[in-house]
């Protein structure tokens, strides 16, 4: 008989007054039995997710880490794949990679970034996700899309979790749910 999946709870946090406070928060989240510490990926009053998640992983031994969610438009997928694989490697395989097409108009406006129509953002996201997964795989990636072109890049380091860290997809529209289902 198959065992049901264990139900897990995570905590989302975004800021701390100091590095010591952030590490203490991560240890407290772990001590309370939560499975994962998540962070949003926005430009406002919060810590930058990648270094903050690494600090949280370094301060704990079992706590999983992740973003809810990395906005595809804020980082080229080659950069995000490298950062995600590095987080997974240095944390001993504890990354949960949350990604999405972007939704917070105010972030785009404040950063002077174009907020493209949903179809364009979702098309770009789907390509970005394919690039990330391709870079996590063994061998060189050759990818030709409308938004991204990758020529013979072998993504290094590779994540510990194989074939890749768990991927969470943020979104509620039918097309995003279809992408998540694949």
Residue ranges with predicted function:
Residues 1-182:
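Active-site-adjacent structural elements that line small-molecule/cofactor binding pockets in enzymes
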């Amino acid at each position: 008989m198959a065992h049901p999946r264990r139900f897990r709870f995570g905590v989302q946090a975004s800021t701390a007054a100091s590095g010591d406070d952030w590490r203490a928060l991560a240890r407290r989240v772990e001590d309370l039995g939560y499975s994962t510490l998540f962070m949003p990926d926005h430009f406002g009053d919060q810590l930058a997710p990648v270094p903050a998640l690494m600090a949280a992983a370094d301060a704990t031994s079992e706590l999983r880490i992740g973003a809810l969610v990395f906005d595809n438009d804020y980082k080229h997928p080659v950069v995000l794949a490298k950062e995600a694989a590095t987080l997974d490697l240095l944390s001993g395989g504890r990354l949960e990679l949350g990604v999405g097409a972007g939704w917070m108009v105010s972030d785009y406006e404040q950063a002077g970034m174009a907020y493209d129509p949903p179809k364009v953002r979702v098309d770009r996201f789907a390509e970005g996700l394919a690039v990330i997964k391709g870079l996590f795989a063994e061998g060189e990636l050759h990818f030709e899309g409308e938004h991204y072109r990758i020529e013979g890049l072998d993504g290094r380091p590779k994540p510990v979790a194989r074939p890749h860290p768990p991927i969470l997809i943020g979104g509620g529209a039918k097309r995003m749910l279809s992408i998540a289902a694949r």
